[in-house]
Structures are given as C-alpha cells and as structure tokens.
Amino acid sequence: MKNQLNFNIVSDEELSEANGGKLTFIQSTAAGDLYYNTNTHKYVYQQTQNAFGAAANTIVNGWMGGAAGGFGLHH
C-alpha cells in the first residue's frame, strides 16, 4: 500500500494564528524564550536548550566577561 502524504504549506503568520491567537515575543532567557498569547492572555515559555546547556553558557559568558575586564559595562 502506497502512503500518500498531502501537506499544505502555511506562512509563519498563518501558523501563529492557527489556534486563533498570536505569540508575541517578550524576552529570551538562559534556557528558552518567553511569549505572550494574545488569544488566551497567558504567558508561554518555550524551552530552547536543556538545563546543563544553559548553565554551561552562563558560566562561559561569565568567564568571557571577566576576561574582557567587564568591557562595556562601565560607561
């Protein structure tokens, strides 16, 4: 039996409105992004990396800032 797949291509905007709402970007965090759903009026957190990856990036960023002497932090 042959499997036939029929997909419709939709734009990002059409996809964001599929459930009747739109996700509005709020801020990026160490392990993900925070959005606000305009339909449900609730905040949505989408994890983009695991806890170990977030901790490792935080440590490395701290080391890099220390190595640069806090360049750009004191104006």
Curated annotation (Swiss-Prot):
<comment type="function">
    <text>Kills Lactococci.</text>
</comment>
<keyword id="KW-0472">Membrane</keyword>
<dbReference type="GO" id="GO:0031640">
    <property type="term" value="P:killing of cells of another organism"/>
</dbReference>
<keyword id="KW-0614">Plasmid</keyword>
<dbReference type="GO" id="GO:0042742">
    <property type="term" value="P:defense response to bacterium"/>
</dbReference>
<keyword id="KW-1043">Host membrane</keyword>
<keyword id="KW-0964">Secreted</keyword>
<keyword id="KW-0044">Antibiotic</keyword>
<feature type="propeptide">
    <location>
        <begin position="1"/>
        <end position="21"/>
    </location>
</feature>
<dbReference type="InterPro" id="IPR007464">
    <property type="entry name" value="Bacteriocin_IId"/>
</dbReference>
<protein>
    <recommendedName>
        <fullName>Bacteriocin lactococcin-A</fullName>
    </recommendedName>
</protein>
<dbReference type="GO" id="GO:0020002">
    <property type="term" value="C:host cell plasma membrane"/>
</dbReference>
<keyword id="KW-0078">Bacteriocin</keyword>
<keyword id="KW-1133">Transmembrane helix</keyword>
<keyword id="KW-0812">Transmembrane</keyword>
<feature type="transmembrane region" description="Helical">
    <location>
        <begin position="30"/>
        <end position="52"/>
    </location>
</feature>
<dbReference type="GO" id="GO:0016020">
    <property type="term" value="C:membrane"/>
</dbReference>
<dbReference type="GO" id="GO:0005576">
    <property type="term" value="C:extracellular region"/>
</dbReference>
<keyword id="KW-0929">Antimicrobial</keyword>
<dbReference type="Pfam" id="PF04369">
    <property type="entry name" value="Lactococcin"/>
</dbReference>
<keyword id="KW-1032">Host cell membrane</keyword>
